[in-house]
Amino acid sequence: MQDPNICQHCQLKDNPGALIWVKCDSCPQWVHVKCVPLKRIHYSNLTSSEVLSYPNSAKQIKSYRCPNHKEGEYLTAYALITQKGKRQRNKENPEDSHINKRYNFRKKKLLDYIALNEGESKRDKMNHPHKESFMKSFEKWKNGSNIINAADFAEKFDNIDVPYKIIDPLNSGVYVPNVGTDNGCLTVNYITEMIGEDYHVDVMDVQSQMNENWNLGSWNEYFTNTEPDRRDRIRNVISLEVSNIEGLELERPTAVRQNDLVDKIWSFNGHLEKVNGEKAEENDPKPKVTKYILMSVKDAYTDFHLDFAGTSVYYNVISGQKKFLLFPPTQSNIDKYIEWSLKEDQNSVFLGDILEDGIAMELDAGDLFMIPAGYIHAVYTPVDSLVFGGNFLTIRDLETHLKIVEIEKLTKVPRRFTFPKFDQVMGKLCEYLALDKNKITSDVSDGDLLSRTTNCAIQSLHAYVIKPEVKYKPLNFTSKKHLAKALADLIS
């Protein structure tokens, strides 16, 4: 049998005139892209366009089938389209998407993991190049002691600054409905039926860490009805927000609901006199970041990232398994993260080898995981998995949130990857604190929000809100300047 690492066309391992390799989707065979006859290459995004030149980057290749199969050789590529003097990818380009994403992947350079192992040489679509490094780092930092019961977690919430696995998730308040399946677990098929096959989802290609535009029907066919060895690529859905989906009864943990800063301050202006004659923003929807469904196939990998605004995260595994590798937001780790984010060759560096004080946690079906603000983390999926999770800002982590937002600006994170309406949330918080509204709230379980806000946090909030680029029109103060003055008066 021929060595699959030898090009089937030129019979060479190394060909100076053909540096880009591609692996067959259906077998281990590798070939040089430039050895494939042009007549066997087709564009995925153009229906009637003759291919006159070879792809010049592994990122342009969508799929490949080698001559060993009866269907014949066939390479599918993305066409690069020139428009108004600029080279642009077609409409499948994830840069065209304007839906808020949870994770602030950098705009500096699209990650090209496809050709990482050998520059632009070989392209294995079923194994992420960082998988081995991730597993080594996971074993190094493996942690079995960060566990806590739900009652203690809720009671100690303000003082918690490390990730915890909740040992009694059934007592946490998190709720995922049982459905009419064999084991009663929520499934991708059920979610598709509830939301609709035509509903848009952003699907991440694990190798390139880039998003593609799919509908739920196509995703369900890929996830539910395609055997793992028949999948053309490893893919991941991590940004399906479902808080507004009727009939999908999901409930967040009690500790999350009690400490979600947006929930506390978003609508309070409606109960106070408006000195500007403005109406409260009753019809202004809250940021939708509270309930996500995450669907990942075996070997899916999400590279190191910060959730937008460094939000805290709750993470309930419905089915499958997850491996988390997390690093705290120490100044040293943050500095290294910024440096890595700004590197042109960041895809060649496994950040976990550089960061310090790691925590590695393995999650199984039924587990509930709580991540505090600012943790830099990567996630690996050993088996097909379905997860219910979400993000939330807290008064506990206000300084961290503000710090991460500045890092997002420094590293030029696209707006759609940032926390929606963050400046508006901060403005409302300023009014809430300045007016000390929490003292007259009817919900005594809220506690005294102002007393939970440190002087340092108020100083950081004041420094943020007075920036000219932060736009907010107060409802209870004549101007942002007067609001800032009232906030400054709180600092003792």
Curated annotation (Swiss-Prot):
This is JmjC domain-containing histone demethylation protein 1. SUPFAM superfamilies: Clavaminate synthase-like (SSF51197), FYVE/PHD zinc finger (SSF57903). A zinc finger (PHD-type) spans 4-72. Residues 254-409 form the JmjC domain. GO terms for molecular function: histone demethylase activity; histone H3K36 demethylase activity; histone H3K36me/H3K36me2 demethylase activity; methylated histone binding; transcription coregulator activity; zinc ion binding. PANTHER family: PHD/F-BOX CONTAINING PROTEIN. It catalyses: N(6),N(6)-dimethyl-L-lysyl(36)-[histone H3] + 2 2-oxoglutarate + 2 O2 = L-lysyl(36)-[histone H3] + 2 formaldehyde + 2 succinate + 2 CO2. Belongs to the JHDM1 histone demethylase family. Binds 1 Fe(2+) ion per subunit. Keywords: Chromatin regulator, Dioxygenase, Iron, Metal-binding, Nucleus, Oxidoreductase, Transcription, Transcription regulation, Zinc, Zinc-finger. Present with 784 molecules/cell in log phase SD medium. InterPro entries: JHDM1_Histone_Demethylase, JmjC_dom, Znf_FYVE_PHD, Znf_PHD, Znf_RING/FYVE/PHD. Substrate binds at T302, K322. Its main location: nucleus.
